């Protein structure tokens, strides 16, 4: 029974995703359906967490929009995600970057890996 579940979930995993970690800056291209139209919406921000394994793996991206912090959680293997681009590699020493929620401006910057 366990092997059957593993096979089915492995079929649903995507292989076209780049490797990324918390601290990296991503551009997530999401398919949005408005009425009868479908378009691509881009959400760019810093990965603050990544959790789960397999089909249930999710990641959260945070950005500042008009002075307000916006966080969005995406299922990693979702068909709604068109593509993911890694813009910058960040150097952090934590797996969960919740402390960024309390920082403003230049204090919220993350060092870039060269």
From Swiss-Prot:
Keywords: Ribonucleoprotein, Ribosomal protein
Any single GO BP term: translation
Domain of life of the native organism: Bacteria
GO molecular function: structural constituent of ribosome
Gene3D superfamilies documented for this protein: 2.30.30.790
A Gene Ontology term for the protein's cellular component: cytosolic large ribosomal subunit
Entry-linked InterPro entries: Ribosomal_bL19, Ribosomal_bL19_CS, Ribosomal_bL19_sf, Translation_prot_SH3-like_sf
Listed Pfam families: Ribosomal_L19
NCBIfam families in the cross-refs: rplS_bact
Family: Belongs to the bacterial ribosomal protein bL19 family.
Function: This protein is located at the 30S-50S ribosomal subunit interface and may play a role in the structure and function of the aminoacyl-tRNA binding site.
Protein name: Large ribosomal subunit protein bL19
Annotated source species: Halalkalibacterium halodurans (strain ATCC BAA-125 / DSM 18197 / FERM 7344 / JCM 9153 / C-125)
Top-level taxonomy: Bacteria, Bacillati, Bacillota, Bacilli, Bacillales
């Amino acid at each position: 029974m366990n092997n059957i579940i593993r096979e089915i979930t492995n079929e649903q995993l995507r292989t076209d995703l780049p490797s990324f970690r918390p601290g990296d800056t991503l551009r997530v291209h999401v398919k949005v359906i408005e009425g009868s139209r479908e378009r691509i919406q881009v959400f760019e921000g810093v990965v603050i967490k990544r959790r789960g394994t397999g089909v249930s793996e999710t990641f959260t991206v945070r950005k500042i929009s008009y002075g307000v912090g916006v966080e969005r959680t995406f299922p990693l293997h979702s068909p709604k995600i068109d593509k993911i681009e890694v813009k910058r590699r960040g150097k952090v020493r934590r797996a969960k970057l919740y402390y960024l929620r309390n920082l403003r401006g230049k204090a919220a910057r993350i060092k870039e890996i060269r």
